Amino acid sequence: MITEGAQAPRLLLPPLLLLLTLPATGSDPVLCFTQYEESSGKCKGLLGGGVSVEDCCLNTAFAYQKRSGGLCQPCRSPRWSLWSTWAPCSVTCSEGSQLRYRRCVGWNGQCSGKVAPGTLEWQLQACEDQQCCPEMGGWSGWGPWEPCSVTCSKGTRTRRRACNHPAPKCGGHCPGQAQESEACDTQQVCPTHGAWATWGPWTPCSASCHGGPHEPKETRSRKCSAPEPSQKPPGKPCPGLAYEQRRCTGLPPCPVAGGWGPWGPVSPCPVTCGLGQTMEQRTCNHPVPQHGGPFCAGDATRTHICNTAVPCPVDGEWDSWGEWSPCIRRNMKSISCQEIPGQQSRGRTCRGRKFDGHRCAGQQQDIRHCYSIQHCPLKGSWSEWSTWGLCMPPCGPNPTRARQRLCTPLLPKYPPTVSMVEGQGEKNVTFWGRPLPRCEELQGQKLVVEEKRPCLHVPACKDPEEEEL
């Protein structure tokens, strides 16, 4: 696998490159992609279909889909994706709950906790978008009618009312309209003046190419009907002409449609391991399109999958650091509960390196100076309440959330640095071990006080990939 910041695999010249659209061998055929986008979980750079997962994942930087639009899985070792954003709160007012998830993605292995690829892990937390819920208001009585909107013929008049009986609260509103209208008649006849309707479309030119026996022309017309002038009382007629004509200008020469030339040679396979993609090209020049003629139909390029049958290098990756060893000092039986600095170490393992990939960068062992407070009785103090934890179980019945106060030890005031060897400077010293803190009893407890609450309006856990189907 190519980790972030690592160089791309070295490309070695193979003894033979195979150009193919090969039938898949081994597992069912999949769609193979050249890139897996960690931020979105989507496959990028479609290489082609009809290949097996094993062939696609010769390059661990690639990714695959079992069907178009399906779940994208990277070819690297499985690990957990980023957490999704929190879903909307299950209620719009008062207290509710919301979910988020992450997925085990990868191939040929398991995520931490022995979880299979494709498995979802959920988190549930309490939420509150708005403290109060909206309360509807009530309308006042209708006000008086306003004057008619016109001075002749028929119009409308309006009356209004206020949303204040009572006023709405917390974003509520009054149902219905704040005003209403009705027809009104002035008993006076208005004159209607004529107005042109919009111009109709231009008629087609008599020819589509220039150079014909007659000069092409186009015409359009309009009607005095928007509205027509009234007779009693008399309205004014429409000003201007009812039609107009013009010459057709700028007509192009008759078009020549383009045609494809022959396909060119197939390009070499661009990779030396895993799958690649070759290309053929052709040119729209047989003939070249002219005078607005249509371009050649179809694609100017076509691609094929090429298989080097060579696995790509896989760089090593460090496991997580192991636990710190006990804090000891050479030639001393025990330094616990004493102002005597010692040393401790932890290690890690470089795993997964194959096919001449890069070795893990960095040290395999980490050493630090320490004071041992293992099983030391120390005076303690109660911490403040922790923040509320996640709702557990996120997908089970009756989830609850909890917070705690802990009896935390007060560490001894030993020197924070030591000089173990003269001339090598000061070294930081870390406290190590599990002390035995002692606090005054709180709510009947000596070490941990816990408070629990139920999570409200809990939504169901649903796979987002299934919701898209």
UniProtKB/Swiss-Prot annotation:
* TSP type-1 domain residues: 28-76, 77-134, 136-191, 193-255, 257-313, 315-377, 379-462
Where is region (Interaction with Complement C3 beta chain) located? 351-359
Keyword annotations for this protein, in alphabetical order, are: Complement alternate pathway, Disease variant, Disulfide bond, Glycoprotein, Immunity, Innate immunity, Repeat, Secreted, Signal
Explain what the record says happens when changing L275A: Inhibits oligomerization
> Outcome of Q343R?
In PFD; type II; significantly decreases Complement C3 beta chain binding
Query: What happens when you mutate E244K?
Result: In PFD; type II; decreases expression, inhibits oligomerization and fails to stimulate bacteriolysis; does not affect binding to Complement C3 beta chain
List of glycosylated residues: 83, 86, 92, 139, 142, 145, 151, 196, 199, 202, 208, 260, 263, 272, 321, 324, 382, 385, 388, 428
* InterPro entries in alphabetical order: CFP_TSR-0, CFP_TSR_C, Compl_asym_regulator, TSP1_rpt, TSP1_rpt_sf
Q: What is known of its domains?
A: TSP type-1 domain 0 binds to TSP type-1 domain 4, and TSP type-1 domain 1 binds to TSP type-1 domain 6. These interactions mediate multimerization.
User: What job does the chain carry out?
Assistant: A positive regulator of the alternate pathway (AP) of complement. It binds to and stabilizes the C3- and C5-convertase enzyme complexes. Inhibits CFI-CFH mediated degradation of Complement C3 beta chain (C3b).
Can you say what this protein is called?
Properdin
Q: Which organism is it from?
A: Homo sapiens
